[in-house]
From Swiss-Prot:
A GO biological process held by the record: leucyl-tRNA aminoacylation
Motif ('HIGH' region): 43-53
Assigned GO CC terms: cytosol
Listed Pfam families: Anticodon_1, tRNA-synt_1, tRNA-synt_1_2, tRNA-synt_1g
Superkingdom of this protein's organism: Bacteria
Encoding gene (name): leuS
Protein's UniProt name: Leucine--tRNA ligase
Taxonomic classification: Bacteria, Pseudomonadati, Pseudomonadota, Alphaproteobacteria, Hyphomicrobiales
Family: Belongs to the class-I aminoacyl-tRNA synthetase family.
Source organism per UniProt: Rhodopseudomonas palustris (strain ATCC BAA-98 / CGA009)
GO molecular function: aminoacyl-tRNA deacylase activity; ATP binding; leucine-tRNA ligase activity
Amino acid sequence: MSNERYNARESEPKWQAKWDEAKIFATRNDDLRKKYYVLEMFPYPSGRIHMGHVRNYTMGDVVARTMRARGYNVLHPMGWDAFGLPAENAAIERKVAPKAWTYDNIAAMKKQLQTMGLSLDWAREFATCDPSYYKHQQKMFLDFLKVGLVEREKRKLNWDPVDMTVLANEQVIDGRGWRSGAVVELREMNQWVFKITKYAQELLDALDTLDRWPDKVRLMQRNWIGRSEGLMVRFALDSATTPAGETELKIFTTRPDTLFGAKFMAIAADHPLAQAAAAKAPKVAAFIDDCKKRGTAQAEIDTAEKQGIDTGIRAVHPFDPSWKLPVYVANFVLMEYGTGAIFGCPAHDQRDLDFVNKYQLGNTPVVCPEGQDPASFVITDTAYDGEGRMINSRFLDGKTIAEAKEEVAKRLETEQLAGAPVGARKVNFRLRDWGISRQRYWGCPIPIIHCPTCDVVPVPDADLPVVLPEDVSFDKPGNALDHHPTWKHVTCPKCGGKAVRETDTMDTFVDSSWYFARFTDPWNTEAPTTPDVVNRMMPVDQYIGGVEHAILHLLYSRFFTRAMKAAGHIDIQHDEPFAGLFTQGMVVHETYRKADGHFASPAEISITVEGDTRRATLLDGGSPVEIGPIEKMSKSKRNTVDPDDIIGTYGADTARWFMLSDSPPDRDVIWSEEGVKGASRFVQRLWRMVNDAAPIAASAPAERPASFGADALTLRKAAHGALDKVLSGIERLAFNVSLAHIREFSNTLGDALARSQTPSPDLAWAIRESTVILVQLFHPMMPHLAEECWTVLGQTGLVSEALWPPIEQDLLVEDSITLPVQVNGKKRGDVTVPRDAPTSEIEAAVLALDTVKQALGGKPVRKVIVVPQRIVNVVG
């Protein structure tokens, strides 16, 4: 075998330059071949790529290169999700302008990505902070406004009085701002919102069409949209206990069957009835103030101790005027969900049970499990939320839950309160409209002008884009656009009077909700999309990214294609942006902790192995280091590996191969130095193998032989079998399976080369064919090595432009077949026979099996039934 080593440092830049010079990855919009659009979620320009990027973009590149080889017009673009808070933080901490920081990072990361050998169409590159991009985003905002998909409304928001900005629920920790530590206030503020709820049912129903999405992602979206069928119930308020002007309390419930188990009503701290109660009760007012200081994240509310205060108000049970229910203000009820009010049935809801146990309100079970004695069925610390029959429920007793729900609905639909039905069937959604206003500088400006005479005025299309000013200061807290001395002061386009710009910018999720459509024609200066192009190139056939984006980004993108359709910018099948979605696992690594408790990086560690024991020591000084758990690579744990170091040491192809080979792509991959070294050894083995095969390939006859001997036929069957299996694995995104088949076939070819010092013409031809196939098989994963091998084999052009070899189906048919064997109905073994063996030969082979003889126990064989190509049954 050849001893020549493959030099990745020389090879990889050379081939990257050749690809770039030939522009082989540029996609033509007028190409009439069938399109294939593969896209990885574009990165935020933090300044450095990490190994997660390497894994993500390698997967997409394998798909892109394979589909290009299969004759598709492949669109595989790259851009930058470039707006966001980190750029402003950099401006504050490092005294560098957000724009400069962002574009410097883009340049650095682009250079890193280019060393990976990705088959990207860089001509389509853009950053979402480019005015040429957000001009069209502003245009779509105005178009959405025209068709009723944008509104301005007042919302209660988390306000950080130190940073002077609105915080997301998740940014409020123990009632304080995550960054400033200030006590957060709930403020009612104007917000621009996208009316995503108009599409709630459509977004839910269309999940059933996304059969190439992971089930877990569809389930997460289904739960987020949260469709529930229930009853809107109007509870009359006892006038003797209620503030003037308040007459009823509306609640939405999915469990009207449990009304006879009600023990209390609960309302949100900002419910109008709570405000009315607070005006007359200082203790209620104090409790409400305390609620406003608590975190508003759903997870925090779910885990916090359930607390409330009795307002003194009483609600009247809809089926019994004498039954009065206390109305509490509770810290677990949110105004944003339902009506901001609930009735509590503690026996069948754990949250309600915790509440009544705290305040000693008692509970009455109204659903009894089948087989339980209703007289002895009690609830203490654990609520029962299963099926059963109604008890303690008057006219509902004995009914199933479904029957009881229907009966309650029918009765309340006919009952009247103030001239209207007490109950009405209603479909409710957990999904809320998308508030996009952010009090930040580094985001897409909202194209609105506020005029004291004309009120809200859209910026005229001719004045787009509204460009961010660059001469901003971050010396003061809050939004730098608010502080700018000139930028916000404008003339009203309607009346010509003095006016001010909207200083809120758009949520950065808006930027990433349509970028995939812009990639289809980023050169269009007049409109966000070119309809005939976007309608032909969309949807994205394969989208790849992290499961952390399963809800917001993916749901907002699904909304955006529908909104863009309503505004005339796109019209695609099912209105879905991503036909196929794949969520890859993370890259994880051991953690290492020094004696002082601080983490050490892998680069600082030496690992020794003694038997089954692994020990870690510091390279500097040799001090022992504790080997900790395997965790996601992160800067805080210092368990990251720099892609530049790996690519610089081993080459991009080695990094790409390792990232694909270690584990199924939807699972986490454990970073291992030994695994990387193993991938590097395989690269060298392939290089030597191709160099060994090259002289034989050169001596092979140009014409295909009329027939093939046994050795040549065996090799050709292995080659075409590998073609079929590797392609199948890539189509299923089972990259590790494809790589295993490549390894297996390389072993077969290596064995053939070792036995073929002077091969016959037919075997030489088969070796040449098989070696060329091997190179094409590993080309999507290791493209630089493949190009070098392609040249060694004397092939013309670039392997990156070569078509996938045709698979000869007759070579996929196995000469033998393995059939299960049953004796008297029980499986006793298998038999392998020639595929075309006659029945008599199969019978003889079966009866010769020791397991069959043992099963018969000396009894005579009555008959042998051979089901061709399926099974053999022996009856004794």
